[in-house]
């Protein structure tokens, strides 16, 4: 099992652990209490910095209940943390946009992440035809 060096930048959050022992995703928590009005945005501090292994990256996403509970959206849809973001003060943050007034308490579970290997190198081969039937265009799958 790989070991990852982590620095906790807040004493207000619980230590990282797998989600209830039944997932390979790990919860991330708000490192401080934040109040947002509808239409405001901020970088929500997550209270950690870590050194990812070479060749790996972290995929950060909101929890499925985050929008329902707080009315916030992760403004970049998905966060990618690569292994070069590994300094003592390189705190992970979640860019959020509030759709309604909300209060996020320190230690609230707000996001989740997993660590993935980088995509292997690929080479693109340009062609005039792909040789497969068209399926109706983007957004058409499942239409009657």
Locations of regions flagged by a protein language model:
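DUTPase catalytic domain/fold
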Residues: 1-144
């Amino acid at each position: 099992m790989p070991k990852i060096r982590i620095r906790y930048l807040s004493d207000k959050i619980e230590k990282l652990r797998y989600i209830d022992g039944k997932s390979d995703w790990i919860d991330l928590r708000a490192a401080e209490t934040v109040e947002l009005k509808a239409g405001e945005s901020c970088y929500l501090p997550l209270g950690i910095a870590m050194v990812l292994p070479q060749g790996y990256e972290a995929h950060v996403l909101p929890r499925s209940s985050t929008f329902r509970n707080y009315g916030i959206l992760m403004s970049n849809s998905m966060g990618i943390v690569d292994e070069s973001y590994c300094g003592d003060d390189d705190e992970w943050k979640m860019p959020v946009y509030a759709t309604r007034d909300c209060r996020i308490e320190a230690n609230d579970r707000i996001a989740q992440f997993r660590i993935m290997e980088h995509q292997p190198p690929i080479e693109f081969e340009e062609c005039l035809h792909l040789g497969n039937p068209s399926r109706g265009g983007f957004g058409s799958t499942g239409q009657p």
